[in-house]
Amino acid sequence: MRLLDSVTKEKIKLDKKDISIYLCGPTVYDDAHLGHARSSVCFDLLRRVLLAQGNRVKFARNYTDIDDKILKKMAQSGQTLEEITEFYIKSYEEDMRVLNVLDPDFKPRATHYITAMLDLIKKLAKDGFVYTLEDGIYFDTSKDEKYLSLSNRNLEENISRLSNEVQKRNESDFVLWKFDENFYESEFGKGRPGWHTECVAMIDSIFENTLDIHAGGIDLLFPHHENEAAQCRCGCKRKLANIWLHNGFVKIDGEKMSKSLNNSFFIKDALKEFMGEALRFYLLSSHYRSHFNYSLSDLENAKKRLDKFYRLKKRLDLGEISDFDVLNDIGIKSEIAKQILEILNDDLNVSKALALLDDFISSANLELDKESKNKILKQNIKEALSELAKIFGFGFMDATLYFQWGVSKEEREEIEKLILERTEAKKNKDFNTADAIREQLNSKKITLLDTPNGTIWEKINA
């Protein structure tokens, strides 16, 4: 596999069997938005590709569960920090399950690594990288000769991005430990960790050695990842990661989506209108490094492309597909899956891979038209679809249920009741009643399909 490193702007070959990946996760003070979804889905694809070709992947995605935004939420809601963070961690993980994001091997929470963070600050203090101001302990960026080497910024660009709320030695200096009487005891004074320190301590505790891949949104490159790299370089005496990967922004009407801009589109909002697999397909449809402009029409088109996958599944009477065990490779056998893996090995060229998937579905349908009773052909296509589902992370549902998505239990019962009435009417040659029931359901966007095994129904989405 070759991946474009955000730092060197060059494709770096990843040819190890054991791969370590750390993905910066959410700050858990609100429901997750599409920006969080895109980052998780893009790097879940990376993980799936590696697992599918037999790599052993050690994957961590953190939770920032102590932060100024969470404290603000506490003040507004009257809830405890634990009540807020537990609620939104659960909410986030529900969203990830619906999007078919594989559960990480490690899900570290910042509050569980306070001792490790203090140990890191002690190391930095011992080597002269820190100083104290009235509100906390700061990292002196002028002591790090390689500071800004990650984001490749110059000092003027750096200064323009930072505020000067306290009298720091350098505009680019950042807080390691914020004094706060409501939190943790330490030799520096009661307080809580700075955001940039949290990730370094968690990475060091879990992985111990230089990461193969550090991933996150492009908005984290500076200052977050720059400051992480500085602390690891100066405190842990090593490079933090060999490859840095950053996914592009999700935009709404051409503007970056963020909670601070009050233009967030929550995952849960999208899932009210579209199933998780359709949203996943949509978020994967552009290259991870490109900026992604949210469009309802594009999401609808992505759903139509996914429909073709399920039409083929339905034609083959292929039911639910089980996702693969992350502890074992899935033993890719089909030629199409091997071809798609080869494409994705080139910096996750997903557009080309999805185009090949479209071609495969079209070709498979043509072959089935010619040889509808060929059992070997059908079995080969079924195996290919199962492998492709595990690589892309969509296509797992039973096809019949897929085309019935979005219908409530009560509506489902009413539909089934009307189908029985229609079946009885047809037996009695009461075709006017049978046609009237069909029209009644059609007006509710339900279409009926009469098959040798009985009548089935689907929801009309367009």
Curated annotation (Swiss-Prot):
GO biological process: cysteinyl-tRNA aminoacylation
Cofactor: Zn(2+)
Motif ('HIGH' region) on chain: 26-36
The EC number(s) this enzyme carries: 6.1.1.16
Residue interval(s) of motif 'KMSKS' region: 256-260
Positions of Zn(2+) binding: 24, 199, 224, 228
Swiss-Prot/TrEMBL catalytic activity: tRNA(Cys) + L-cysteine + ATP = L-cysteinyl-tRNA(Cys) + AMP + diphosphate
Cofactor remark: Binds 1 zinc ion per subunit.
Keywords annotated in UniProt: Aminoacyl-tRNA synthetase, ATP-binding, Cytoplasm, Ligase, Metal-binding, Nucleotide-binding, Protein biosynthesis, Zinc
UniProt: ATP binding residues: 259
Top class in the EC scheme: ligase
Subcellular localization(s) per the UniProt record: Cytoplasm
InterPro entries for the chain: Cys-tRNA-ligase, Cys-tRNA-synt_Ia_DALR, Cys-tRNA/MSH_ligase, Rossmann-like_a/b/a_fold, tRNA-synt_1_cat_dom, tRNAsynth_Ia_anticodon-bd
Pfam families named in the record: DALR_2, tRNA-synt_1e
MF (Gene Ontology): ATP binding; cysteine-tRNA ligase activity; zinc ion binding
SMART domains linked to this entry: DALR_2
Gene Ontology CC annotations of this record: cytosol
Subunit structure, interactors included: Monomer.
PANTHER family to which the protein is assigned, alphabetical: CYSTEINE--TRNA LIGASE, CYTOPLASMIC (PTHR10890:SF3), CYSTEINYL-TRNA SYNTHETASE (PTHR10890)
Protein family per UniProt: Belongs to the class-I aminoacyl-tRNA synthetase family.
Name of this protein: Cysteine--tRNA ligase
Protein species of origin: Campylobacter jejuni subsp. jejuni serotype O:2 (strain ATCC 700819 / NCTC 11168)
Gene name of this polypeptide: cysS
